């Protein structure tokens, strides 16, 4: 039989050994009752620990009420409590939202004043010129003639200081001196005393000469004799030209005459 089991492939379980300790069920039951007396099925020995409940016993105070007056607690709905909790939550939300209203109002009040603050800044427009002469000089191109520039440079051969397109910076007194020595526009300006440097403008053609000076300067606005005479009076402070008592008459200084004579000797007219 043993060989047959080995051949069929089943494991062979040896018989129990004699060294094993036999299981004593009585000992286990006895220890359980000693250490855990309440696990015992003997209910009579512990009858004094129980409380007898009689389901038909009713307190004397409730004997006068009918049975239909008593209801189970599970069927009772607390709608009043739910409404109370909801009312408390709404009050809390109202308390939290109330302080925010003045904040939004104050912000809108501040923003509304921003455009008015911008209007307080003064405009950055340029100052008005003191005269039309100065305005014309400021608007003229940088290479064009201006009466406020330094002493004019000597012109090249064949070119006069007063010619248009020469691109030589020239002052007004030099422009007039070149016209007098060249004889150009003799109907508008002429010598009263060449040796003394006294000259006079024509009352009829003075505006034509002023217009040519405006073209020489490159002014956008029309040059007038009044503006040109204002520039000549300013030369009285520096000494190049002074006003003579005679009407429309002026006089060059000796320095300007000597400088002009030197220019003529270097570049004689062709």
Swiss-Prot record:
It is found in: Nucleus. Pioneer transcription factor, which controls hematopoietic cell fate by decompacting stem cell heterochromatin and allowing other transcription factors to enter otherwise inaccessible genomic sites. Once in open chromatin, can directly control gene expression by binding genetic regulatory elements and can also more broadly influence transcription by recruiting transcription factors, such as interferon regulatory factors (IRFs), to otherwise inaccessible genomic regions. Transcriptionally activates genes important for myeloid and lymphoid lineages, such as CSF1R. GO terms for biological process: cell differentiation; positive regulation of B cell differentiation; regulation of transcription by RNA polymerase II; transcription initiation-coupled chromatin remodeling. Residues 153-162 have a biased composition (Low complexity). DNA binds at residues 217, 230, 233, 243. GO terms for molecular function: DNA-binding transcription factor activity, RNA polymerase II-specific; RNA binding; sequence-specific DNA binding. This is Transcription factor PU.1. The keyword Membrane does not apply. Transcriptional activity at macrophage-specific genes is inhibited by interaction with GFI1, which results in the inhibition of SPI1-induced macrophage differentiation of myeloid progenitor cells, but not that of the granulocyte lineage. GO terms for cellular component: nucleus. Coiled coil: none annotated. Residues 170-253 bind DNA. The lineage of its organism: Eukaryota, Metazoa, Chordata, Craniata, Vertebrata. Binds DNA as a monomer. Can form homomers. Directly interacts with CEBPD/NF-IL6-beta; this interaction does not affect DNA-binding properties of each partner. Interacts with NONO/p54(nrb). Interacts with RUNX1/AML1. Interacts with GFI1; the interaction represses SPI1 transcriptional activity, hence blocks SPI1-induced macrophage differentiation of myeloid progenitor cells. Interacts with CEBPE. Interacts with IRF4/Pip and IRF8. Interacts with JUN. Interacts with RB1. Interacts with TBP. Keywords: Activator, Developmental protein, DNA-binding, Nucleus, Phosphoprotein, RNA-binding, Transcription, Transcription regulation. Residues 124-162 are annotated as: Disordered. It comes from Sus scrofa (Pig). Disulfide bonds: none annotated. The modification Phosphoserine is found at residues 140, 146. It comes from the Eukaryota. The keyword Nucleus applies.
């Amino acid at each position: 039989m043993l060989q047959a089991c080995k051949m069929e492939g089943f494991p062979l379980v040896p018989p129990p050994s004699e060294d094993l300790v036999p299981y004593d069920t009585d000992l286990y039951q006895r220890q359980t009752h000693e250490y855990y007396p309440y696990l015992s099925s003997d209910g009579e020995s512990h009858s004094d620990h129980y409380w007898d409940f009689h389901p038909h016993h009713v307190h004397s105070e409730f004997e006068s009420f009918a049975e239909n007056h008593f209801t189970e607690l599970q069927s009772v709905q607390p709608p009043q409590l739910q409404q109370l909790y909801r009312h408390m939550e709404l009050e809390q939300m109202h308390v939290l939202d109330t302080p925010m209203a003045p904040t939004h109002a104050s912000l809108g009040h501040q923003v509304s004043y921003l455009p008015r603050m911008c209007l307080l800044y003064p405009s950055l427009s340029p100052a008005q010129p003191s005269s039309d002469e100065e305005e014309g000089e400021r608007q003229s191109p940088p290479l064009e003639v201006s009466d406020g520039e330094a002493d004019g440079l000597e012109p090249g051969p064949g070119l006069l200081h007063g010619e248009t397109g020469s691109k030589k910076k020239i002052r007004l007194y030099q422009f007039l001196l070149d016209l007098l020595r060249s004889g150009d526009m003799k109907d508008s300006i002429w010598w009263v005393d060449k040796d003394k440097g006294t000259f006079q403008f024509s009352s009829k053609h003075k505006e034509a000469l002023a217009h040519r000076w405006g073209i020489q300067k490159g002014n956008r606005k029309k040059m007038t004799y009044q503006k040109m005479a204002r520039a000549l009076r300013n030369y009285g402070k520096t000494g190049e030209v002074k006003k003579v008592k005679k009407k429309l008459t002026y006089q060059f200084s000796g320095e300007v005459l000597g400088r002009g004579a030197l220019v003529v000797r270097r570049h004689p007219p062709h």
